[in-house]
């Protein structure tokens, strides 16, 4: 939508983002980021297109953390609200649901929160990302584990890894990246678990970790999975030389768990 305003003309962007449901915390971070960007761009004079200058605004709807709802709202934004430029939702699953809609209408979508590699193997022409894909998220952690082994006079192949991942496209892509990196270095994966759908208990995995004593524990389950992991690692007194985890910031583990966040 290109509309007139009191100052400059306006470009309206559309976004279906989670304000309720399991991604509500991450959705809040997403909208905060989008709003900050729009505010700063407008403060600096807006966006110049040709010989005209436009201010930006965003039309939001709550996708309720549900892919089907996200797809419905993308249809609404484009076909009813007349949106010509979209911003992505939070999560790979929601992005995967919305991308076919924006593709169908030829509406560009810039997304910063759908990192699953599978999003970028579909041949989409109107999907643009500004982040690393998920299989790269923990590559540096596995490389660090190899370096730590070498500083202790050990081979990287001596490193044992325990893993627990949510069963969603993002987390499974993170898992695939960890597995590939570990295999390339000859590391042994001693635990390869799937987190429960509710993401509220990983004690079964942590019991195995205590028994097998791996060198590295890797966890990816979005904000709720990170919070559960930090809480139960402390409760069960699980001692692992190195822990690599996604979504610690969005889970607010320092604020919520204090010293247990550094257990």
Indicate where each model-derived feature is located.
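Signal peptide-proximal N-terminal region
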Residues: 32-58, 150-154, 183-187
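Short beta-strand segments enriched in small/hydrophobic residues
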Residues: 10-31, 89-90, 159-166
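Sec/Tat signal peptide C-region and signal peptidase I cleavage site
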Residues: 2-8
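Beta-alpha junction/loop-to-helix N-cap segments that form part of ligand/metal-binding clefts
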Residues: 25-30, 47-121, 130-133, 195-202, ...
């Amino acid at each position: 939508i290109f509309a007139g305003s009191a100052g400059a003309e306006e470009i309206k962007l559309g976004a279906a983002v989670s304000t309720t449901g399991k991604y509500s915390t991450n959705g809040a971070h997403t909208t905060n980021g989008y709003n900050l960007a729009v505010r700063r761009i407008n403060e600096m004079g807006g966006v110049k297109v040709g010989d005209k200058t436009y201010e930006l605004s965003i039309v939001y709807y709550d996708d309720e953390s549900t892919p089907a709802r996200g797809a419905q709202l993308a249809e609404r934004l484009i076909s009813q609200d007349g949106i010509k430029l979209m911003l992505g939702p939070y999560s790979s699953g929601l992005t995967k649901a919305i991308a076919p809609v924006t593709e169908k209408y030829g509406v560009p979508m810039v997304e910063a929160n759908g990192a699953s590699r599978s999003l970028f193997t579909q041949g989409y022409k109107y999907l643009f990302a500004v982040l690393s894909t998920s299989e790269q998220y923990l590559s540096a952690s596995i490389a660090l584990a190899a370096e730590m082994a070498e500083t202790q006079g050990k081979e990287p192949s001596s490193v044992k890894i325990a893993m627990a991942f949510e069963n969603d496209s993002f987390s499974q892509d993170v898992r695939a990246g960890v597995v590939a990196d570990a295999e390339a270095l000859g590391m042994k994966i001693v635990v390869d678990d799937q987190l429960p759908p509710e993401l509220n208990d990983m004690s079964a995995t942590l019991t195995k970790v205590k028994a097998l004593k791996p060198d590295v524990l890797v966890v990816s389950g979005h904000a709720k999975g990170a919070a559960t992991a930090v809480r139960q690692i402390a409760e069960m007194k699980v001692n692992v030389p190195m822990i690599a985890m996604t979504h610690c910031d969005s889970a607010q583990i320092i604020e919520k768990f204090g010293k247990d966040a550094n257990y």
